[in-house]
């Protein structure tokens, strides 16, 4: 829920509890309006878990594809509820899936979101090629920083290591990224950025 929605719900709740006459019932529409702000939040286009081992791509219309694997069952269920899907579509095993608009091979996947080409790369060799042709890159592997334009790299293994799970939304002005670290805030035990790192990791 957006911060504004939480504030509206809180105000409505206080109104409902403090007042004792019939006017207190006017707080109910206020609380409802606060909860309705959830509908204003665009669902993430791509979600990546805290170790990069689980990826979900939101196709819209209640359809989502998730990377294969038997682990991360709790996260899978949580993501399905968050994206309001009963069951994800199968992850393309090879070639281009015309229905999902996603092309995958063992080195990663490429898709189009908001009119831009997005590559999710798990192989260093493929990363070099995708860094030349894709508009945005999500690196699930390490490569030398000089081989990929920083402006194209939305997410790297270093970001995942430092910030945990990521939710990415693509729009006309480019991608916006929400991380689990932002939600929990900085803690004494949180990992911190090391600008001296030689690799995108």
What residue spans do the PLM features occupy?
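Membrane-interface segments at or immediately adjacent to transmembrane helices
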Residues: 39-109
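Solvent-exposed soluble domains appended to multi-pass membrane proteins
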Residues: 101, 105, 109-116, 121-201
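Transmembrane helix-bundle segments that form internal channels/tunnels in multi-pass membrane proteins
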Residues: 1-60
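Acidic/histidine-rich
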Residues: 31, 42, 55, 63, ...
């Amino acid at each position: 829920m957006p911060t504004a929605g939480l504030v509206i719900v809180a105000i409505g709740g206080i109104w409902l509890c403090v007042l004792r006459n019939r006017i207190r019932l006017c707080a109910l529409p206020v609380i409802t309006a606060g909860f309705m702000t959830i509908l204003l939040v665009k669902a993430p286009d791509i979600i990546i878990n805290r170790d990069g081992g689980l990826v979900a791509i939101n196709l819209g219309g209640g359809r989502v594809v998730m990377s294969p694997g038997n682990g991360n069952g709790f996260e899978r269920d949580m993501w399905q509820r968050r994206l309001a899907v009963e069951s994800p579509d199968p992850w393309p095993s090879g070639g281009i899936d015309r229905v999902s608009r996603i092309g995958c091979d063992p080195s990663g996947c490429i898709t189009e979101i908001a009119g831009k080409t997005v590559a999710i790369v798990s192989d260093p060799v493929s990363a070099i090629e995708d860094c030349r042709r894709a508009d945005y890159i999500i690196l699930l592997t390490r490569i030398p920083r000089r081989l990929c334009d920083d402006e194209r790299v939305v997410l790297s293994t270093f970001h995942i290591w430092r910030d945990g799970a990521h939710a990415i939304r693509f729009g006309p002005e480019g991608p916006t990224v929400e991380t689990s670290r932002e939600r929990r805030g900085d803690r004494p035990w949180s990992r911190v950025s090391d600008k001296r790192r030689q690799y995108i990791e």
